[in-house]
């Protein structure tokens, strides 16, 4: 059984200082037994990154749609796991106003980092919260999950304007703003006619990321984890898809020649 201090030591062993901006996708079950359970996991993260910015995805794409269009950041539950919903209840945590792909954070300049998402019309709009990870030296920590849960790669594809990733027609949604007013939002969703779950193909990039040292294998609790450098991940994807922008979905595998020039 892991204690809070042991979990914090594992974060230190990853080479993280606690001053970074870190987005964590997680599976609580994969972490194993923890003294105090999920609350202790959150305590470890919040305390360790107390001088940085801790971010968790709080997506609502599963339950906010044309039939159920109203997103209320104070009430709409996250559809991406136990820890994310518990995080939303913590004092000091701020949630963005993106109606389908919100993010919550606590720490250094959290409100500033999360601001403006109500103006986006795609899941991971260039310049938005996911894309901002690149400009601040941000990391993505995948705890017990793989790149199929790495939302940052969706943002990379949006920045690089990869075709056939978004619906042509937007959904009309509504956002309950912090002051209680309602803002209409016209949101395109992830869509590919041949692959209903685009992110499942992101695992094809795993070896490229490891070879290029954009991603390292680490451990948190019992969980096998991947620690990703956002800018380095962006560069690997950019090189890999340059000859064929749709290859992550359309190719059964990606040839090593696509990333050999980046291997250090």
Where are each of the predicted segments found?
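N-terminal basic/disordered segments at the start of proteins
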Residues: 2-9
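Acidic/aromatic/glycine-rich contiguous surface patches that form carbohydrate-binding/processing clefts
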Residues: 188-264
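Internal, conserved structured core segments that host functional sites
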Residues: 65-155
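Glycine-rich phosphate/diphosphate-binding loops that line cofactor/substrate pockets in enzymes
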Residues: 11-21, 133-136
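Short, flexible loop segments at boundaries between secondary-structure elements
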Residues: 51, 164-193
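N-terminal active-site beta-alpha-beta segment that forms phosphate/nucleotide-binding
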Residues: 17-67
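Amphipathic alpha-helical segments in well-structured domains
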Residues: 4, 38-42, 80
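Short, solvent-exposed amphipathic alpha-helical segments in soluble enzyme
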Residues: 39-41, 156-161
């Amino acid at each position: 059984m892991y204690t809070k201090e042991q979990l914090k030591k594992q974060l230190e062993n990853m080479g993280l200082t606690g001053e970074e901006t870190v987005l964590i996708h997680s599976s609580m079950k994969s972490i194993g037994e923890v003294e105090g359970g999920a609350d202790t996991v959150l305590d470890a993260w919040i305390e360790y990154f107390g001088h940085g910015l801790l971010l968790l995805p709080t997506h609502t794409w599963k339950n906010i749609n044309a039939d159920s269009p109203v997103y209320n950041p104070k009430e709409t539950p996250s559809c991406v796991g136990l820890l994310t919903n518990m995080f939303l209840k913590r004092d000091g945590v701020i949630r963005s106003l993106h109606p389908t792909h919100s993010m919550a954070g606590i720490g250094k300049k959290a409100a500033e980092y999360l601001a403006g998402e109500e103006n986006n019309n795609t899941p991971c709009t260039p310049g938005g919260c996911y894309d901002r990870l690149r400009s601040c030296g941000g990391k993505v920590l995948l705890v017990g999950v793989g790149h199929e849960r790495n939302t940052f790669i969706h943002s990379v594809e949006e920045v690089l304007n990869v075709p056939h990733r978004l619906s042509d027609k937007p959904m009309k949604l509504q956002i309950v703003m912090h002051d209680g007013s309602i803002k209409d939002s016209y949101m395109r969703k992830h869509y590919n006619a041949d692959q209903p779950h685009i992110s499942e193909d992101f695992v094809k990039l795993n070896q490229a990321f490891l070879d290029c040292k954009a991603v390292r294998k680490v451990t948190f609790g019992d969980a096998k984890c991947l620690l990703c450098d956002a800018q380095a991940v962006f560069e690997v994807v950019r090189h890999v898809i340059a000859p064929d922008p749709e290859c992550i979905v359309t190719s059964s595998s990606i040839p090593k020649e696509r990333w050999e020039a980046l291997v250090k």
